[in-house]
């Protein structure tokens, strides 16, 4: 109902929407927010749809002052802001950014969202209608405003991470997180450098057991048992969930600098709900100087959002010695 969407958008400063798949239910909301200069935050992890929205609405958003911020949940706040946090520390200590960062999921306890599974299914369906989306999904720089950077380190099969001395497996959220990280870099004038490389994988442990686990994870469908959209875990399960993501910056002298981002609730529900709420509040209350446009979390809110997440959302951002 486009009329009711228009009325809603005209009556608020910021629309916070959790209604996905966004490629099915988001286009009119983004269109109306952009047209009326209303801010917008979502949980989108659908790069094909985001690519379309950027192409269709970015120019007008700059004109109307609408700040559209995609991916304000577990995809991709811990990863986007984790890289941003670490690069700021590297630049402060070494005078230039790290040209390579490895994202490594150390722990992730909790159920995946039924909406995440539905979004993936919708993306697969849209590929049949729009085969040109294959190129978007395969390109790590698909959201980087036409910029094409260096070839990225492969992350699609189990490998041994020699610097961490552990086997790592493909991480099913990497295809969206990596695109968002590269978009952030582009939006910030390539703060991380034009030669920046970034990949994400899931730590499984050392030795033969670690290898077997990594190969198993690489062969499975992590969303096979996800709940239906609108369904989810119990409060106890949400409260007992957590996650821990390590970021490893490889420096020119051969050393590394590590940062960790942790969350105190399950990633798909408990933590994500707090992240998107804090994003909306931050955007409206603390980012009045941010120009209109289509953003990722880091260039939109950066340090301001990190501070809010640590104060009110149960996240931590720390450098590890």
List each model region and its residues:
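Gly/Ser/Thr-rich loops at beta-strand to alpha-helix junctions
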Residues: 47-49, 73-80, 111
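Conserved Rossmann-fold cofactor-binding substructure of NAD(P)-dependent oxidoreductases
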Residues: 1-14, 18-24
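A generic structural signal for well-ordered alpha-helical segments
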Residues: 29-33, 57, 61, 309-310
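Rossmann-fold NAD(P)-binding glycine/threonine-rich loop
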Residues: 44-66
């Amino acid at each position: 109902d486009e009329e009711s969407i228009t009325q809603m958008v005209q009556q608020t400063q910021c629309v916070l929407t959790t209604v996905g798949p966004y490629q099915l239910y988001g286009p009119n909301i983004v269109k109306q927010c952009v047209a009326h200069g209303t801010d917008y935050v979502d949980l989108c992890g659908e790069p094909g749809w985001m690519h379309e929205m950027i192409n269709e609405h970015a120019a007008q958003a700059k004109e109307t002052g609408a700040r559209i911020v995609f991916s304000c949940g577990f995809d991709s706040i811990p990863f986007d802001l984790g890289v941003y946090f670490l690069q700021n520390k590297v630049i402060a200590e070494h005078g230039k950014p790290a040209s390579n960062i490895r994202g490594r999921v150390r722990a992730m306890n909790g159920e995946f969202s039924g909406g995440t599974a539905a979004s993936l299914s919708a993306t697969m369906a849209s590929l049949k209608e729009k085969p040109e989306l294959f190129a978007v999904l395969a390109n790590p720089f698909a959201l980087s405003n036409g910029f094409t950077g260096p070839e990225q380190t492969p992350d699609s099969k189990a490998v041994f991470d020699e610097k961490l001395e552990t086997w790592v497996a493909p991480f099913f959220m990497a295809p969206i997180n990596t695109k968002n990280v590269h978009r952030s870099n582009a939006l910030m004038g390539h703060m991380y450098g034009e030669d920046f490389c970034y990949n994400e994988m899931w730590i499984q442990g050392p030795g033969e057991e670690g290898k077997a686990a990594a190969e198993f994870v690489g062969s499975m469908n992590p969303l096979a048992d996800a709940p239906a959209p609108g369904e989810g875990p119990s409060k106890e399960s949400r409260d007992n969930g957590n996650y821990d993501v390590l970021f490893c910056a490889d420096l020119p002298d051969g050393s590394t600098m590590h940062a960790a981002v942790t969350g105190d609730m399950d990633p798909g529900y408990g933590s994500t709900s707090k992240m998107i709420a804090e994003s909306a509040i931050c955007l409206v209350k603390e980012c009045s100087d941010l120009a209109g446009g289509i953003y990722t979390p880091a260039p939109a809110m950066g340090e301001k959002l990190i501070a809010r997440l640590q104060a009110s959302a149960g996240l931590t951002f720390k450098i590890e010695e």
